[in-house]
Amino acid sequence: MKVRSAGSDRDVLCVTEEDLAGEDEDMPSFPCTQEGRAGPRCNRCQKNLSLHTSVRILYLFLTLLLVAVAVLASLVFRKVDSLSEDISLAQSIYNKKLVSMQENLQGLDPKALINCSFCREAEQLGQEIRKVQEELEGLQKMLLAQEVQLDQTSQTHELLSTRSSQISQEMGSCSFSIHQVNQSLGLFLAQVRGWQATTAGMDITLKDLTQECYDVKAAVHQINFTVGQTAEWIHGIQRKTDEETLTLQKIVTDWQNYTRLFGGLRTTSAKTGEIVKTIQTTLGASSQRISQNSESMHDLVLQVMGLQLQLDNISSFLDDHEENMHDLQYHTRYAQNRTVERFESLEGRMASHEIEIGTIFTNINATDNHVHSMLKYLDDVRLSCTLGFHTHAEELYYLNKSVSLMLGTTDLLRERFSLLSARLDFNVRNLSMIMEEMKAVDTHHGEILRNVTVIRGVPGPPGPRGLKGDTGVKGPVGSRGPKGDPGNLGPPGPQGPQGQPGEPGPVGERGPAGPRGFPGLKGSKGSFGTGGPRGQPGPKGDVGPLGPEGPPGSPGPSGPQGKPGISGKTGSPGQRGATGPKGEPGIQGPPGLPGPPGPPGNQSPY
């Protein structure tokens, strides 16, 4: 199997770049990948490649063997047909010649058989004819033996054809099983690709979650920084307020001191009524100082009012920060809950993926065992095929030997046939000459018997054997006979030499699409698959119908105090009012300091 995966699934699946380009006949070859990079081929891929090459070589060897057996069978049958035709022609020719000889012998006059030389020649002819008949019987026996051998060769050819058909059926079943294995591998590859896509999606979601965690941490860090800044700012404002309160306390203590002084002045006003006139000059300065102090007090009151407004703004700003902090805490808690839920769902998915990966490993081990069993079965088939090929080779060797023996015997038969045909031609010529001589002698004897009027008595005993006469003079060449009947068709000639290869023809047009094949057999029912992972949450449902109106709720709590408005711009100074009436005389001031001594007076004349 071409099986591999990336990362932790290194030894799970090995996949090729060309898929599948040709997965209909051969098993796919996939390059192993390790962590997204192409790695070396695994041992299983090499075994699969060697198995494919061996199966292809076995297919080629089977086709060549079938072609060779068919060619040899055709050659053997052609030679046997030619031999049978030659033998049938020879038998027909011999039969015709024997029939013609018998007719000629029957046409002879029985009275002419008195001649001893003719009797001897007839006996010799009979002996030769018997020899020819014996040779023909031997030929018939040889033909019967050859027919038996031909029957044996036909039986062996039938055995070879049946075995080749069995081998082709076994190879077809092997190819069908390999095709089924390839289909199962394709389905398994599709499942593994889906698992890889899911793992990639999980990686992307984990990256998104980590990025969200980093963003939340950065937001919390920024919030902490802003809270620290606001705390420092509040601390500075508190310092300023402490300083202002200290100044106010100082002013209050001064005011109390002044009131005490004024009380002492009131108590001492009765006592110092005498010196009020002396210190009226200092009252103007003191009144001016009092007016200045009142103005400074008014300014201090204005500053205190501004500080109070600033404190109100700061308090509203702190309230806003508290609300923002509450919102951030709520969002962080919500994000934490969401992250916890996502991590729990991811843990569930990881557990389901671990279960699926375990099932994948079990399926891979099962397929590995199945492939090993298939390899063992293919090895057994290869051994049986090699044994069958060896037996077929031995049978073909013996067939070649028998064919060579048959060819030798056919050559001997042809030579004997040529010799017998020559001897028959010679004997037929001699017989024709003897028959002509016998006809001439018969005519001569007839004429003599007609001329003789003396009645012969009983024939006496035969006389002694005379001397052998001299060979007669060769008679004249006879006239040319009529044209004979057309003979039977001769045997087909030998196959001529193979011609030179012709030029390649033009590329033909693409033929029409073939008819759709028959539907394949229904596969066996698969085992129960493992439970699928938990599905994603469905889309949000439609808005339901409005429910009945509920009872009026209880009044809610009062809302927080609103933010103070922005302080307006200081208005332009108003017009100076009219001078008011003269006020009541103020409190008598304290006695002034004693003045410097005056100049010496003039001495009166008195």
From Swiss-Prot:
Residues 497-516 have a biased composition (Low complexity). Glycans are attached at residues 115, 182, 224, 257, 313, 337, 365, 400, 430, 451. Residues 526-535 have a biased composition (Gly residues). InterPro entries: Collagen (IPR008160), Oxidative_Scav/Glycosyltrans (IPR052376). It comes from the Eukaryota. The chain crosses the membrane at residues 57-77. Residues 456-558, 559-601 form the Collagen-like domain. Residues 78-606 are extracellular. Residues 548-558, 591-606 have a biased composition (Pro residues). It holds the Pfam family Collagen. One of its GO terms (cellular component) is Golgi membrane. It is a single-pass type II membrane protein. It is found in: Endoplasmic reticulum membrane; Golgi apparatus membrane. Keywords: Collagen, Endoplasmic reticulum, Glycoprotein, Golgi apparatus, Membrane, Repeat, Signal-anchor, Transmembrane, Transmembrane helix. Residues 1-56 are cytoplasmic. Its main location: endoplasmic reticulum. Residues 455-606 are annotated as: Disordered. Seems to protect cells by scavenging oxidative molecules or harmful products of oxidation. This is Scavenger receptor class A member 3. The gene is Scara3.
